[in-house]
Amino acid sequence: MRTRIKICGLTREADVDAAVEAGVDAVGFVFYAKSPRAVSVAHAAALARRLPPFVTPVGLFVNAAPHELAAACAAIPTLMLQFHGDETPAQCDAVGRPYLRAARMTPGFDLLNFAQQFSSAQALLLDAYVEGYGGGGKVFDWSLVPSGVTPPLVLSGGLSAANVTDGVLKVRPWAVDVSSGVESAKGIKDADAVRRFCEAVREADARVAASEI
């Protein structure tokens, strides 16, 4: 199985183009004002129009009001939602869009129970716990991930070309998500780093395929 790839925190046309060129499956736009990678709905919509078919735009939200979610969905008709705050299952479902739900991994966190609560999610995005909200660019202990979790898992948190191969081999996620690990500055992606990250994911997939022969 091919591991899907999402690049998050895009703010520039050139970075969207580089991600598409590298073969990513999804790109993320941050709609959280406190993030250095935050973009307006109008800017995100303009960036999303550069995406070819079968590359999914994803909007990251933290405790957003219903009207904010509705505005983003109206501006970007194909938008998938990613909830990174304290949203309840009912709040996530109420929008009526496919969504990812972030889980902040710490020792003792009951991911199986969390997965049951958010069984309607398209996937659970596993990130390291940091103070505040949003990704902190930190790697969590991958051994905390139990087997048999549904829905599918998206591995996130401090990934880069240097460690994503190992992460895919150990966790076997449906997808991986990276932001700071492919940046030259906050919100500014490095096209070469994006390319190397994607190559490292494909290297992991090749190893998995070889082991199954």
Swiss-Prot record:
<comment type="pathway">
    <text>Amino-acid biosynthesis; L-tryptophan biosynthesis; L-tryptophan from chorismate: step 3/5.</text>
</comment>
<dbReference type="GO" id="GO:0004640">
    <property type="term" value="F:phosphoribosylanthranilate isomerase activity"/>
</dbReference>
<protein>
    <recommendedName>
        <fullName>N-(5'-phosphoribosyl)anthranilate isomerase</fullName>
        <ecNumber>5.3.1.24</ecNumber>
    </recommendedName>
</protein>
<keyword id="KW-0028">Amino-acid biosynthesis</keyword>
<dbReference type="Pfam" id="PF00697">
    <property type="entry name" value="PRAI"/>
</dbReference>
<keyword id="KW-0057">Aromatic amino acid biosynthesis</keyword>
<dbReference type="InterPro" id="IPR013785">
    <property type="entry name" value="Aldolase_TIM"/>
</dbReference>
<dbReference type="InterPro" id="IPR001240">
    <property type="entry name" value="PRAI_dom"/>
</dbReference>
<dbReference type="InterPro" id="IPR011060">
    <property type="entry name" value="RibuloseP-bd_barrel"/>
</dbReference>
<comment type="similarity">
    <text>Belongs to the TrpF family.</text>
</comment>
<keyword id="KW-0413">Isomerase</keyword>
<dbReference type="InterPro" id="IPR044643">
    <property type="entry name" value="TrpF_fam"/>
</dbReference>
<dbReference type="GO" id="GO:0000162">
    <property type="term" value="P:L-tryptophan biosynthetic process"/>
</dbReference>
<keyword id="KW-0822">Tryptophan biosynthesis</keyword>
